[in-house]
């Protein structure tokens, strides 16, 4: 039975265009809800198994994880959290044609989606900044240790926790989305008060614009650096050139991850900003659900990029499941390879020792690639 708006305990906190109706009733047709439910089910299954597989393969070599790999695993944790903690709520609600978990469930769902989404974006920001420093500042990689990666993880989760908990303590709130079967940050508070505008603007800047700017800046600098150094690398022997090619490939994978995330979330951000500072009731309900569904698919992209785009990674995963040699897992590299960078840094001081170091490093990688036919195209 539909709820009467007078029975809602948080009626005064609702967006103005939801106060005269049941905010948890779906505004879509039954057919549209069923399509959305099946779509989210497929996305959730693929994301759960994909990111779970990444974590499983990582756990098999946890003693060998490097700092950048730790950050990539954290990204998989964020994506898995979105799929396991959040998606079931919306899927069930779509099939029930209304949000069935009440205000407590609405707040929980809104918090979880914001928490893991923010954690994912900040993790990608940290990875892009890390790669920028490693490639453009040679001395950075010398002192970077595992403990620094764990400190970075603590900062990421503290940052996400701070911004996502603010609405739960009175600065902002979580509310139903216009179509009724999902909940999100209450963007409409920006139209209610000056304090609401300040809060929404702060969220947009610190949780979207600033991280996106850092990502774009970092990869723009990386592209410029790779282009300027490619001619220099061509003069080295084939082993150093191979390391350079692999480094560029892994950087492209990272860029694809960030691009996929931003492509999925930017339409949703645009609609949210329009809801906060424009005329939210001017957006058709049927249209407002599309950016939401697109954003919810972001957690599925990364495993596909890992296992399809990076063929070497996928090959070594398959070899690991068949019980091949443990060293074949060395090709499970979701981080920027630093062979060229290190060799270039040492070359300026000790050319002979640099050549020996790089050759040994690359030959070691080649020997692992031969096990299980990893790296064959």
Curated annotation (Swiss-Prot):
Give the disulfide map. Answer: 106-183
Q: Which residues lie on this side of the membrane: Extracellular?
A: 1-33, 96-108, 172-197, 274-288
**Of which family is this protein a member?**
Belongs to the G-protein coupled receptor 1 family. Opsin subfamily.
Lipid-acceptor residues (S-palmitoyl cysteine): 315-316
Classification lineage: Eukaryota, Metazoa, Chordata, Craniata, Vertebrata
Residues of this chain annotated as glycosylated in UniProt:
4
Membrane-spanning regions, if any?
34-54, 75-95, 109-129, 151-171, 198-218, 253-273, 289-309
GO MF term list: 11-cis retinal binding; G protein-coupled photoreceptor activity; G protein-coupled receptor activity
Q: In which tissues is it expressed?
A: Expressed in the brain (at protein level). Weakly expressed in the skin and liver (at protein level). Abundantly expressed in striated muscle cells. Expressed in Math7/Atok7-dependent retinal ganglion cells in the ganglion cell layer (at protein level). Additionally expressed in horizontal and amacrine cells in the inner nuclear layer of the retina (at protein level). Expressed around the base of hair follicles and in epidermal and sebaceous gland cells of the outer ear (at protein level).
> What's the protein here called?
Opsin-5
Under the heading InterPro entries, the entry gives: GPCR_opsins (IPR050125), GPCR_Rhodpsn (IPR000276), GPCR_Rhodpsn_7TM (IPR017452), Peropsin (IPR002962), Retinal_BS (IPR027430)
Feature: compositional bias, Basic and acidic residues = 363-377
Native organism: Mus musculus
Q: Which Gene3D superfamilies match?
A: Rhodopsin 7-helix transmembrane proteins (1.20.1070.10)
């Amino acid at each position: 039975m539909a709820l009467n708006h007078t029975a809602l305990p948080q009626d005064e906190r609702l967006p103005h265009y939801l106060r005269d109706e049941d905010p948890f009733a779906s505004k879509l047709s039954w057919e549209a809800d069923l399509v959305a439910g099946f779509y989210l089910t497929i996305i959730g299954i693929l994301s759960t198994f994909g990111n779970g597989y990444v974590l499983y393969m990582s756990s098999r070599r946890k003693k060998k994880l490097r700092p950048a790999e730790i950050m990539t695993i954290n990204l998989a944790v964020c994506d898995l959290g979105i799929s396991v903690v959040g998606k079931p709520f919306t899927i069930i609600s779509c099939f029930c044609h209304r949000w069935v978990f009440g205000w407590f469930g609405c707040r929980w769902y809104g918090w979880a989606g914001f928490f893991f989404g923010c954690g994912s974006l900040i993790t990608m920001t940290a990875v892009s900044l890390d790669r920028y420093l490693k490639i453009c500042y040679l001395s950075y990689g010398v002192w970077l240790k595992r403990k620094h990666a764990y400190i970075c993880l603590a900062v990421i989760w503290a940052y996400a926790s701070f911004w996502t908990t603010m609405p739960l303590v009175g600065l902002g709130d979580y509310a139903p989305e216009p179509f009724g079967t999902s909940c999100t940050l209450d963007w409409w508070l920006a139209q209610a008060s000056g304090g609401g505008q300040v809060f929404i603007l702060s969220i947009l800047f610190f949780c979207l614009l600033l991280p996106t700017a850092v990502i774009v800046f970092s990869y723009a600098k990386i592209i410029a650096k790779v282009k300027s150094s490619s001619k220099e690398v061509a003069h080295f022997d084939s082993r150093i050139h191979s390391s350079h090619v692999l480094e560029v490939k892994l950087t492209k994978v990272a860029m694809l991850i960030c691009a996929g995330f931003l492509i999925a979330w930017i339409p949703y951000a645009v609609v949210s900003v329009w809801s906060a500072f424009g005329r939210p009731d001017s957006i058709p309900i049927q249209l407002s659900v599309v950016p939401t569904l697109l954003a919810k698919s972001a957690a599925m992209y990364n495993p596909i990029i890992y296992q399809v785009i990076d063929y070497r990674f996928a090959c070594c995963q398959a070899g690991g499941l068949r019980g091949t040699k443990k060293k074949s897992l060395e090709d499970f590299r979701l981080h920027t390879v630093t062979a060229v960078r290190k060799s270039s840094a040492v070359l300026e001081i000790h050319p002979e020792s640099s050549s020996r170091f790089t050759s040994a490093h690359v030959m070691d990688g080649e020997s692992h690639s031969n096990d299980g036919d990893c790296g064959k195209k």
